[in-house]
């Protein structure tokens, strides 16, 4: 039994952990009933990334205008690029009783936590630091300096794990997806969420 308002699910984790890979695999499954909120970024598209599907790619000037116009639920600057979440889609979809899935950076997740304390926060973790370094270096699209910056930032982000509700280890993509699906199902059965609907049915404040 679902709440009338949708559940906001926020997944984040360090650079190189495989957030995009897990999200794409999750949304390719036929039984998934989540609505993905596409983020905005000023970084260059990577090979295979599609405008409006993976990200909305914008210039710094365009992004900063969105900040000034309060069009972002959260935004952060990470390794020299802006990342943010358009607010209109999130609010509209939640109000329709649909679950919204955000795949965002750790800095941004902490801002969403302050705005939506009732949201579900999942930290995607690597099986080891060695594996994380291998994944970041294996992209082959970034300079040595940028790789070092990402590694440094990733280690700092791992220390933020305590701020999340659940931790999912991304040792295998399919297993990570199954864990996330199980967490979402369990969260919808949480007493606090279910009780609110019954209180409304019974006319109890």
Swiss-Prot record:
CC annotations in GO: cytosol
Coiled coil stretches, renumbered: none
Limits of the Guanylate kinase-like domain: 6-185
Positions with a binding annotation for ATP: 13-20
SUPFAM superfamilies the UniProt entry points to: P-loop containing nucleoside triphosphate hydrolases
Pfam families: Guanylate_kin
Keywords of the record: ATP-binding, Cytoplasm, Kinase, Nucleotide-binding, Transferase
EC number(s) stated in the UniProt entry for this protein: 2.7.4.8
Catalytic activity reported: GMP + ATP = GDP + ADP
One example GO MF annotation: guanylate kinase activity
Compartment annotation: Cytoplasm
Highest taxon listed in the record's lineage: Bacteria
UniProt KW Hydrolase keyword: no
Main location, first listed in the record: cytoplasm
InterPro entries the record matches: GK/Ca_channel_bsu (IPR008145), Guanylate_kin-like_dom (IPR008144), Guanylate_kinase (IPR017665), Guanylate_kinase_CS (IPR020590), P-loop_NTPase (IPR027417)
Membrane-spanning ranges: none
UniProt function note: Essential for recycling GMP and indirectly, cGMP.
PANTHER family named among the record's database cross-references: GUANYLATE KINASE, GUANYLATE KINASE-RELATED
Protein family (similarity comment): Belongs to the guanylate kinase family.
Protein name, UniProt field: Guanylate kinase
